[in-house]
């Protein structure tokens, strides 16, 4: 082989090597990154298998949707359990990934999502559960319901399909969904998934309101009552103070010092009231029922009886002595209250009892008459 032929062979060898390198480079770069559609499909499969990030996103959106409906905030110690429930619920949405198209330097992928109708699947269970609710603690009550609700997820139907356009961008050798697309996707995976929480929270919110009414009336603890009624604590405090300076006090024509003695004695007597609200249930007609254990505070009743007996016997020679005798009697029972036998009162509250009006208020008044009979 002459020199010219040798140079030709070298050139052919170099071209061959270069071609091989180009083929290998093309194989490594062109086949190493999956198609945008495949990435979206894998992402959706991961969501169906239970994805922590999506469960957190769903939970936060759910908490925001119920924020302000109830006085109690969503409990921190319930979040982990609710995320697990959401991960299982995500196994029941369906999808179809369609075509992808380039969009600027990113991609758009069309996807049809049929959400899992969680609310429908657990609706009957929710209703039955709150009719027999035994717990008075929000986290415990919801956790029990979630365990039952997970069994119902197998009956979950799918809602109407919705076509979404998801935007994805390149990230290293793969892709990632944009934040907006993640949020849009989260909004369409499940429906009614906060229903178990709301079913329980609604009932316990009514119970909590009843507790706040009693505590504000008898104990002077007004902060929770103010939150339930939308008033300020100052307004609630003023209402409490006025309850001890009504027509009865004005009719007695007391001095400033005597008024103070009367109000202090009455506040102590009221504060000594004993009541305990049991579990609350929701009735089939949409009302609420609970059992309240009451140990009647007989102090006012005994004070009136003692005053009447003393007056009838001629113990008081003047109106001033009568007033002083009454104040002294109240102060005695304020320091040493007298109680009757404990009893259980069944209390029925109508729908909308959160405003405590009409029949609902009559029920509460009946309860109050047994807590502190006059």
Name each model feature, range by range.
Residues 3-17:
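Bacterial N-terminal signal peptides that target proteins for export
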Residues 108, 127-201, 313-321, 335-374:
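Short beta-strand edge/turn micro-motifs at domain boundaries
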Residues 76-143, 257-324:
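Surface-exposed, charged secondary-structure patches
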Residues 53-54, 116-118, 219-224, 297, ...:
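Primarily extracytoplasmic ectodomains and periplasmic/lumenal surface modules that are beta-strand-rich
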Residues 16-24:
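Sec-dependent N-terminal signal peptides
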């Amino acid at each position: 082989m002459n020199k010219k032929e040798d140079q030709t062979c070298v050139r052919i060898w170099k071209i061959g090597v270069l071609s091989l390198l180009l083929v290998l480079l093309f194989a490594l770069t062109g086949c190493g990154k999956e198609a945008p559609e495949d990435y979206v499909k894998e992402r959706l499969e991961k969501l169906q298998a239970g994805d922590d990030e999506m469960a957190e996103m769903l939970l936060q959106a759910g908490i925001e949707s119920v924020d302000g409906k109830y006085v109690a905030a969503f409990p921190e110690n319930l979040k982990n359990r609710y995320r697990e429930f959401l991960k299982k619920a995500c196994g029941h949405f369906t999808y179809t990934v369609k075509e992808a198209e380039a969009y600027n330097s990113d991609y758009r992928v069309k996807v049809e999502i049929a959400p899992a109708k969680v609310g429908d699947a657990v609706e009957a269970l929710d209703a039955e559960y709150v009719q027999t609710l035994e717990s008075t603690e929000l986290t415990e009550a919801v956790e029990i319901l979630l365990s039952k609700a997970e069994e119902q997820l197998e009956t979950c139907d799918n809602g109407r399909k919705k076509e979404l356009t998801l935007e994805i961008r390149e990230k290293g050798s793969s892709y990632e969904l944009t934040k907006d697309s993640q949020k849009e996707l989260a909004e369409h995976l499940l429906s009614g998934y906060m229903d178990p929480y709301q079913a329980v929270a609604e009932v316990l919110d009514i119970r909590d309101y009843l507790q706040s009414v009693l505590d504000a009336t008898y104990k002077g603890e007004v902060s929770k009552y103010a939150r339930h009624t939308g008033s300020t604590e100052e307004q609630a405090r003023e209402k409490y103070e006025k309850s001890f300076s009504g027509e009865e006090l004005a009719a007695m024509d007391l001095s400033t010092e005597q008024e103070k003695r009367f109000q202090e004695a009455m506040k102590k007597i009221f504060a000594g009231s004993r009541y305990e609200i049991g579990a609350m249930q929701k009735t089939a007609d949409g009302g609420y029922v609970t059992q309240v254990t009451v140990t009647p505070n007989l102090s006012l009743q005994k004070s009136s009886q003692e005053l009447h007996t003393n007056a009838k016997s001629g113990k008081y020679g003047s109106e001033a002595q009568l007033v002083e005798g009454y104040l002294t009697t109240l102060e005695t029972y304020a320091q040493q209250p007298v109680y009757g036998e404990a009893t259980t009162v069944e209390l029925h509250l109508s729908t909308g009892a959160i405003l405590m009006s009409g029949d609902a208020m009559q029920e509460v008044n009946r309860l109050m008459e047994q807590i502190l009979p006059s």
